[in-house]
């Protein structure tokens, strides 16, 4: 997904001090944001001009203490044609030399009232989400009790129907059929729908339904962290499934591993309730409440007691 300066302006609510439509259409190619420190002293070795340049109180204060000549020299070196934009936080006054250099190099100048660290965090979060490499997987992504659950399985096994039942039970649909996943960092996986499929659910025999229109805004979500994967598969006699919940199967997507449960589909089983329980049980484990561990401790105590009575 490509991101332009205009998209960043709209998302983070920045004020455009200088820049027309052409300058705002410039593409941002990296989520890294630079806060020029040594560059202010004239040291430009290893400088990355392709990054957004963010100036806060420290950078601004140093600039204002320079002579006009030195300020003009530093800003002309710092602002390059490949720089997407220069951003000034805290509504600090824009030096004339900065506007002059931006006009010369064709760079937009943006401003925000937000403190520098918070502004940097907001922009990084947005750019990381947009510029991260996507992987498309087949399945249904649901938000169940605030936790992202990816439901997978063979075609026709009932993933979408299960998703619809979960929506009726008060949970939220994120994506159906195609889920675009990306790593926010080394340990966090996020998922979102393809734009053409947003809020839509395909039910065999019924067709495509608009969940937003039928069930309201509370039934959908634009994106979600993916924390648990559930694979639905047909029950076969003799096939071994985890009965205690102490399995450690994982699914790796975009370099991030998440736990995966395999749940057998059988006539008469209410899959939405089973998946709901699986999500709650996983969350309980994350909070330190492990029913499997409790059972094993009770079993050990019982065995020890029986051995003592012999």
Curated annotation (Swiss-Prot):
Q: Report the catalytic activity.
A: [HPr protein]-L-serine + ATP = [HPr protein]-O-phospho-L-serine + ADP + H(+); [HPr protein]-O-phospho-L-serine + phosphate + H(+) = [HPr protein]-L-serine + diphosphate
A Gene Ontology biological process in which this protein takes part is: regulation of carbohydrate metabolic process
Record-annotated residues binding ATP? 153-160
Name the residues that bind Mg(2+): 160, 202
Record entry for activity regulation: Kinase activity is inhibited by inorganic phosphate (Pi). In contrast to many other bacteria, neither kinase activity nor phosphorylase activity is affected by fructose 1,6-bisphosphate (FBP).
Pfam families the UniProt entry points to: Hpr_kinase_C, Hpr_kinase_N
| Keywords in alphabetical order | ATP-binding, Carbohydrate metabolism, Kinase, Magnesium, Metal-binding, Multifunctional enzyme, Nucleotide-binding, Serine/threonine-protein kinase, Transferase
Induction text: Constitutively expressed. Transcription of S.bovis hprK is not significantly altered by growth rate or energy source.
Instruction: Show the active-site residues.
Output: 138, 159, 177, 243
The EC number(s) this enzyme carries? 2.7.11.-, 2.7.4.-
Q: What does the record give as cofactor?
A: Mg(2+); Mn(2+)
The ranges of region (Important for the catalytic mechanism of dephosphorylation) come to 264-269
**GO MF, one example:** protein serine/threonine/tyrosine kinase activity
Region (Important for the catalytic mechanism of both phosphorylation and dephosphorylation) location: 201-210
Top-tier EC class: transferase
Assembly and binders: Homohexamer.
Q: Which PANTHER family match?
A: HPR KINASE_PHOSPHORYLASE, PROTEIN YJDM-RELATED
Record function comment: Catalyzes the ATP- as well as probably the pyrophosphate-dependent phosphorylation of 'Ser-46' in HPr, a phosphocarrier protein of the phosphoenolpyruvate-dependent sugar phosphotransferase system (PTS). HprK/P also catalyzes the pyrophosphate-producing, inorganic phosphate-dependent dephosphorylation (phosphorolysis) of seryl-phosphorylated HPr (P-Ser-HPr).
Other known facts: Both phosphorylation and phosphorolysis are carried out by the same active site and suggest a common mechanism for both reactions.
Q: Which family does it belong to?
A: Belongs to the HPrK/P family.
Q: What is known of its domains?
A: The Walker A ATP-binding motif also binds Pi and PPi.
Q: What's the protein name?
A: HPr kinase/phosphorylase
Native species: Streptococcus equinus (Streptococcus bovis)
Source organism phylogeny: Bacteria, Bacillati, Bacillota, Bacilli, Lactobacillales
């Amino acid at each position: 997904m490509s991101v332009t300066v205009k998209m960043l302006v709209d998302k983070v609510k920045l004020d455009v001090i200088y820049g027309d439509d052409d300058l705002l259409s410039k593409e941002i190619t990296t989520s890294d944001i630079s806060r020029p420190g040594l560059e202010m002293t004239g040291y430009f070795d290893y400088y990355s001009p392709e990054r957004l340049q963010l100036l806060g109180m420290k950078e601004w204060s140093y600039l204002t203490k320079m002579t006009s000549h030195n300020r003009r020299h530093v800003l002309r070196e710092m602002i390059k044609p490949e720089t997407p934009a220069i951003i000034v936080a805290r509504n600090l006054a824009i030096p004339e030399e900065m506007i002059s250099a931006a006009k010369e190099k064709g760079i937009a100048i943006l401003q925000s009232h937000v403190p520098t660290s918070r502004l940097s965090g907001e922009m990084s979060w947005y750019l990381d989400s947009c510029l991260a490499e996507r992987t498309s997987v087949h399945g249904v992504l649901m938000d169940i009790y605030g936790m992202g659950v990816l439901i997978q399985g063979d075609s026709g096994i009932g993933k979408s129907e299960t998703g619809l039942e979960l929506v009726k039970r008060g949970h939220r649909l994120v994506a159906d059929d195609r889920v675009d996943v990306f790593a926010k960092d080394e340990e966090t996986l996020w998922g979102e729908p393809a734009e053409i499929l947003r809020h839509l659910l395909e039910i065999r025999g019924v067709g495509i339904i608009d969940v937003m229109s039928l069930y309201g805004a509370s039934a959908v979500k634009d994106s979600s962290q993916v924390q648990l994967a559930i694979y639905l598969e047909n029950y076969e006699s003799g096939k071994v499934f985890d009965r205690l919940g102490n399995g450690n199967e994982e699914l790796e997507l975009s370099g991030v591993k998440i736990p995966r449960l395999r749940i057998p589909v059988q006539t008469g089983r209410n899959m939405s309730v089973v998946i709901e329980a699986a999500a709650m049980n996983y969350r309980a484990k994350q909070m330190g409440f492990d029913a499997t561990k409790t059972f094993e401790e009770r079993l050990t105590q019982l065995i020890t007691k029986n051995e003592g009575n012999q």
